[in-house]
From Swiss-Prot:
Residues 297-312, 327-337 have a biased composition (Basic and acidic residues). InterPro entries: BSD_dom (IPR005607), BSD_dom_sf (IPR035925), BSD_domain-containing (IPR051494). Residues 167-219 form the BSD domain. Residues 313-325 have a biased composition (Low complexity). This is BSD domain-containing protein C22A12.14c. The modification Phosphothreonine is found at T123, T125. The modification Phosphoserine is found at S235, S241, S246. Keywords: Cytoplasm, Phosphoprotein. Pfam families: BSD (PF03909). Transmembrane segments: none annotated. It comes from Schizosaccharomyces pombe (strain 972 / ATCC 24843) (Fission yeast).
C-alpha cells in the first residue's frame, strides 16, 4: 500500500469540496444579508465581498495543492525512500539545533562568568581554609555548633548552681537579633543547624536559648574549673582587657624608672650643695677667728686694722654666699620632698 492509499480514507473528493464550499457560501450570504438591513449594512457588505474573494482564493489554493499531491503520489515513489529522506532531514535539523544550543550555552557561560575581586582572594573564612588559627573560645564555639545535642537536648541539670529555668527568664532572644545575625554570618555550620532543626525538631526560641546557655554559662564555668589562666577564660565580650593591663603595667614600670632616676639626680645635687656649704662655713669660721685675734705689736696696728677690715668684708661676703647656698640647699630639699610626695600619690 502506497502513501496515497494510506491517506485516501481521510481525504475528501473534489465534488465534496465543491458542495461544502457552496453550502458555506450560501450560509454566509444569508447571514450577511440579514445583517445588511441593520445599522452596519455598508460595513457588512464590504466584509461580504472580501469574504467571497477570500473563499475563492482559498479554494483555488486548496485545489492546486491537491493536484500537486496527487501528481507526486502517482509517480510511484517508494515509501522507504521517502521515509529515508525524511529521516535524513530530521537528523540534519537535529544536528543543527544541537550545535546551535551548544554554541549559545558556551557563549552564555563565558558571559556570565565573573572573575573574583582581588580584595576577596585573601579574605580568610571558616570554610575556605582549615589552616586558620583558632583560639580556645573559637574552638569551643565550633564544638557547640557542630554538636546537634546542643540544640535538641532538653536541659534539666543546673550548671554550677545555675538552673536553666531561672536563667532563661532573664534572657530575651529578640534582644539578641543582631548578635544572632553576626553568628550566622560568621559560622555557616550554625546556619545549617538552624535550617535543619527549626522548626521541625525544635522551636526558634528554644534553639537559641539552648545555644546561648552553653555559650554563656556552661563553657565559661568549665574553663574556670579546668584551672586555666585568666587569659583563656573567655567572656564572649571585649577581649582586649589583657592587652590593656599589659600596657598599663609597662607604663607603670616606665614611670617608676623615671622617678628613680629623678630621685638619684636630686640626691646627687643635694650632696654637691652640702659639700659647697661646708666649705663656705669653714671659710667663714676662719675669717671670724682672724677678726678676734689681738694685735701683738703697736707698730703693726694700722696694717692689722686694714687687714681686719678686709677680713670683715671677706667674712661678710662669705656669710652672704653661705646664706645663698643654704637657700639653694633648702630649695633642692623641698624639690626632692615634692618628688617623693608625687611618687607616693602616683603609687
Amino acid at each position: 500500500m502506497d502513501l496515497y492509499d494510506y491517506m485516501a480514507p481521510t481525504t475528501t473528493t473534489e465534488e465534496d469540496d465543491e458542495e461544502g464550499y457552496e453550502k458555506l457560501k450560501e450560509e454566509m450570504g444569508s447571514a450577511l444579508n440579514n445583517l445588511t438591513n441593520g445599522k452596519f449594512g455598508l460595513f457588512w457588505n464590504s466584509m461580504k465581498e472580501k469574504s467571497e474573494n477570500f473563499l475563492d482564493d482559498t479554494k483555488g489554493k486548496a485545489s492546486s495543492g491537491m493536484q500537486q499531491l496527487k501528481s507526486q503520489l502517482e509517480e510511484n515513489i517508494p515509501v522507504n525512500s521517502a521515509m529515508e529522506n525524511l529521516r535524513k532531514v530530521e537528523e540534519t535539523a537535529g544536528s543543527f539545533w544541537s550545535g546551535f544550543g551548544s554554541t549559545v550555552n558556551g557563549f552564555l557561560d563565558q558571559a556570565l562568568q565573573i572573575s573574583p575581586k582581588e580584595d576577596d582572594v585573601s579574605t580568610p573564612t571558616h570554610e575556605a581554609s582549615s589552616s586558620v588559627f583558632l583560639n580556645r573560645h573559637e574552638r569551643q564555639l565550633l564544638e557547640l555548633v557542630q554538636n546537634e545535642n546542643t540544640f535538641t537536648q532538653i536541659i534539666s541539670e543546673p550548671s554550677h548552681g545555675i538552673t536553666f529555668e531561672s536563667w532563661e527568664k532573664e534572657i530575651s532572644i529578640d534582644g539578641k537579633t543582631e548578635e544572632i545575625s553576626l553568628l550566622l554570618e560568621e559560622y555557616p555550620d550554625l546556619r545549617k543547624q538552624m535550617e535543619s532543626l527549626v522548626p521541625s525538631e525544635v522551636s526558634y526560641d528554644d534553639f537559641w536559648k539552648r545555644f546561648f546557655w552553653h555559650k554563656e554559662v556552661v563553657q565559661p564555668i568549665k574553663a574556670i574549673q579546668s584551672g586555666n589562666d585568666e587569659e583563656e577564660i573567655f567572656s564572649w565580650g571585649d577581649e582586649r582587657s589583657d592587652e590593656e593591663e599589659s600596657d598599663n603595667e609597662q607604663v607603670n614600670d616606665e614611670k617608676k624608672q623615671s622617678s628613680e632616676e629623678d630621685t638619684t639626680e636630686n640626691n646627687s645635687a643635694a650632696e654637691v650643695i652640702d659639700e659647697t656649704v661646708n666649705d663656705l662655713e669653714s671659710a667663714v669660721s676662719k675669717g671670724l677667728q682672724i677678726e678676734t685675734q689681738p694685735a701683738s705689736h703697736d707698730g703693726e696696728v694700722d696694717g692689722e686694722v686694714k687687714e681686719e677690715e678686709e677680713n670683715k668684708v671677706s667674712s661678710s661676703s662669705n656669710i652672704e654666699a653661705s646664706q645663698s647656698s643654704l637657700e639653694v640647699k633648702d630649695e633642692a630639699n623641698r624639690k626632692v620632698d615634692d618628688d617623693d610626695e608625687d611618687d607616693d600619690d602616683w603609687e
